[in-house]
Curated annotation (Swiss-Prot):
Record-linked InterPro entries: EF-4 (IPR006297), EFG_III/V (IPR035647), EFG_V-like (IPR000640), EFTu-like_2 (IPR004161), LepA_C_sf (IPR038363), LepA_CTD (IPR013842), LepA_IV (IPR035654), P-loop_NTPase (IPR027417)
Membrane topology: Peripheral membrane protein
Source domain of life: Bacteria
PANTHER family linked to this entry: TRANSLATION FACTOR GUF1 HOMOLOG, CHLOROPLASTIC, TRANSLATION FACTOR GUF1-RELATED
Function description: Required for accurate and efficient protein synthesis under certain stress conditions. May act as a fidelity factor of the translation reaction, by catalyzing a one-codon backward translocation of tRNAs on improperly translocated ribosomes. Back-translocation proceeds from a post-translocation (POST) complex to a pre-translocation (PRE) complex, thus giving elongation factor G a second chance to translocate the tRNAs correctly. Binds to ribosomes in a GTP-dependent manner.
Organism: Lactobacillus helveticus (strain DPC 4571)
Residues that hold GTP according to the record: D23, H24, G25, K26, S27, T28, N140, K141, I142, D143
Identification of the protein by name: Elongation factor 4
SUPFAM superfamilies to which the protein is assigned, alphabetical: EF-G C-terminal domain-like (SSF54980), P-loop containing nucleoside triphosphate hydrolases (SSF52540)
Family per record: Belongs to the TRAFAC class translation factor GTPase superfamily. Classic translation factor GTPase family. LepA subfamily.
Amino acid sequence: MDLEKLKDYQKHIRNFAIVAHIDHGKSTIADRILELTDTVSQRQLKNQMLDDMPLERQRGITIKMNSVEVKYHARDGEDYIFHLIDTPGHVDFSYEVSRSLAACEGALMVVDASQGVQAQTLANTYVAIDDDLEILPVINKIDLPSADIPKTKEEIEEMLGLDASEAAEVSGKTGQGIEDMLEKVVKDIPAPSGDITAPLKALIFDSKYDDYRGVVMSVKIEDGVVKPGDRIKIMNTGKEYEVTEVGVSSPHPVKKDLLIAGDVGYITANIKSVRETRVGDTITDATNPTEEPLEGYRQIPPMVYSGMYPVDNRDYDDLKEALQKLQLNDAALEFEPETSTALGFGFRCGFLGLLHMDVVQERLEQEFDLGLIMTAPSVDYHAIMNDGSTKVIDNPSDLPDAGEYQEVQEPYVKAEIMVLNDFVGPVMELCQRKRGEFVTMDYLDKYRVNVIYNMPLAEIIFDFFDDLKSSTKGYASLDYEITGYRSTDLVKIDILLNKEPIDALSFIAHRSEAQDRARQMTSMLKKLIPRQNFEVDIQGAIGAKIISRATIKPYRKDVTWKIHTGDPDRRAKLLEKQKRGKKRMKAVGRVEVPQDAFMAVLKMHDDDIKGK
């Protein structure tokens, strides 16, 4: 092992992430870099090259960060090794951004020339500044007729505090300016400073499970060297393993003889249990260990909780195993077993937001072929009991009876909404309707305002983002953070089917809205629950008091009217759709309840409740 050669190799490494607001073109820029450097052949090249999860390609968004090694021949005649990490832009996946930045010395901060700086641009820049990274501003989509480069530069300087005079001006679509941008990476982003001769110290920033190789750990080597045959130790657990393979993603796995300080790659060591490695752990040499582990990641607590149950109770163990494998690859997912009288055995899962919840459900159904029932999402409430103790309520059905607690507290957030001047009125109206308290309003420039409200998290997570987009014609962005818990007049609303309470349909609401929401819920369930052979009585109740009611009439005796569908193809389609729907039904008592019914609380928009 020639130390001088390794040191020279290390000097030519550049580790950087691409971060931006959602839809500002990060993945397209990554595609152009792969194309320009011949990392991927023209035949293999496709849009969103680094988005290798089928769900990412379906939705057209980045969900998981992804790293790739790129070789670049610079204008100075030298060859450089780029480790490029593409990151998500949606607020739900901000934890992926913070993890990826820990593996980098620099970041490309991409801003859409037609939209300017947005909420997640600000949030991601602050994370990069906290990590002491070299930030290179990149102005993308300069080929658009609506691109305003001088204005975007002004915003970058005023709002982000970065020097934009030398900002790279690129088009991810056409490839214009990409090579100049890569030259800036060579010149401005520092090489990693790790000590190759020190004991091995590597940070696990991601991992996934492979049926043949076991756990595949994505790592940034901070110090030292690692190669196949080495004995390594996970510092958090103390467990030791023998390295079977090391390599890099380019973008498909490529084996290497060794990884050195500064490299971003992967390690396999025949680790079969998903519990034995955790994102944020430090790997060291078992025979010559480092003394201090690397600073791991701040664990981000879930914002939203939902019950997850297999449609077929026999799939419980398969669901548990699938969640464990997914958790390895998704550090923000939390789950613990729970039992529902209506749905049987399942899990209470914690997510960072509704998009995160949707993605987890779709991945479980697509990648593990599971049929699932999800209950309506809820936030974490605190019940202050009569004896002064605090009970954490992440499932509405667990809220004690009224006489057993002094008060209920709910989480509040500071919501920052960036919006065009023309839409400030509708945004303030929306926030007030959602129980928001106005804090301040900052005029960022002639066109845009940053509006800040304190709001209950429960009001944000359901349909707030959709309502915000519709009330501003899409010209608004949102960022929020939890600020603490406040005492609020909340009540639990139970839903009864034929006088039998269904725990999975319970929800918590502000007392002033309780009756409206209960009425909305019962009428929604009346539409969603199919007719049965008997009458179904749907009731909403606070304690013993019934506050809303709806009735589903039974089938008529003669059901043959169904088969007189004119078009036989249409009839076949309807039957197939009905068959799929029945798979996602649960018998609650004698009543068949579809998946949609458990999510009905999401459909209770404010406008409907207020009769607008």
